[in-house]
C-alpha cells in the first residue's frame, strides 16, 4: 500500500510557527487587567462586571448596556428588590411599569369619598390590592 507523500514545505511550517508562537507566549506573560477597587469591594455600581459575572443572559445585558437610560431612583430600587427577593419575579417586573405610570397620573377625584393615592397607584386594576 503506497501512501501519497504529504510533505509540508519547511517555509510554511516556519511561517506558521513565527505567526502563532509569539502571541501565544506573550499572552502567558500578560496578567489580566485588574478590577477597579470599587468593583472588588462592591462599593460602587460596576454594571459591566456584574453583567459578566452575574447569573442570566450576559449577551443581552451587554448589548443593551449602552442603550439604557438611568431611570428614577425609586424605580431602580424597586427593580433591584424584585430581582433579589424570593418569589415570582416576572409578575412584579411586568406590572412595575404600569404602577410607575399610575403614580404619575393626576388624581381625578377630590373629596372624602376618594381612595388615597397610594392605594390606587399600587392596587391592580379590578382587584382589591390584597
UniProtKB/Swiss-Prot annotation:
The keyword Lipid biosynthesis does not apply. GO terms for molecular function: neuropeptide hormone activity; type 1 orexin receptor binding; type 2 orexin receptor binding. The modification Methionine amide is found at residue 96. Disulfide bonds join 38-44, 39-46. The modification Pyrrolidone carboxylic acid is found at residue 33. Residues 97-130 form a propeptide. Keywords: Amidation, Cleavage on pair of basic residues, Cytoplasmic vesicle, Disulfide bond, Endoplasmic reticulum, Neuropeptide, Pyrrolidone carboxylic acid, Signal, Synapse. It is found in: Rough endoplasmic reticulum; Cytoplasmic vesicle; Synapse. Residues 1-32 form the signal peptide. One of its GO terms (biological process) is neuropeptide signaling pathway. Belongs to the orexin family. This is Hypocretin neuropeptide precursor. It comes from Mus musculus (Mouse). The lineage of its organism: Eukaryota, Metazoa, Chordata, Craniata, Vertebrata.
Amino acid at each position: 500500500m503506497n501512501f501519497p507523500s504529504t510533505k509540508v514545505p519547511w517555509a510554511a511550517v516556519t511561517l506558521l510557527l513565527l505567526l502563532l508562537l509569539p502571541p501565544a507566549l506573550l499572552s502567558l506573560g500578560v496578567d489580566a487587567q485588574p478590577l477597579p477597587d470599587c468593583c472588588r469591594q462592591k462599593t460602587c455600581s460596576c454594571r459591566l462586571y456584574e453583567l459578566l459575572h452575574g447569573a442570566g443572559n450576559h449577551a443581552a445585558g451587554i448589548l443593551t448596556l449602552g442603550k439604557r437610560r438611568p431611570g428614577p431612583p425609586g424605580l431602580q430600587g424597586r427593580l433591584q428588590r424584585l430581582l433579589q427577593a424570593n418569589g415570582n419575579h416576572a409578575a412584579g417586573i411586568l406590572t412595575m411599569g404600569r404602577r410607575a405610570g399610575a403614580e404619575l397620573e393626576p388624581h381625578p377625584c377630590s373629596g372624602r369619598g376618594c381612595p388615597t393615592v397610594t392605594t390606587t397607584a399600587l392596587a391592580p386594576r379590578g382587584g382589591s390590592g390584597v
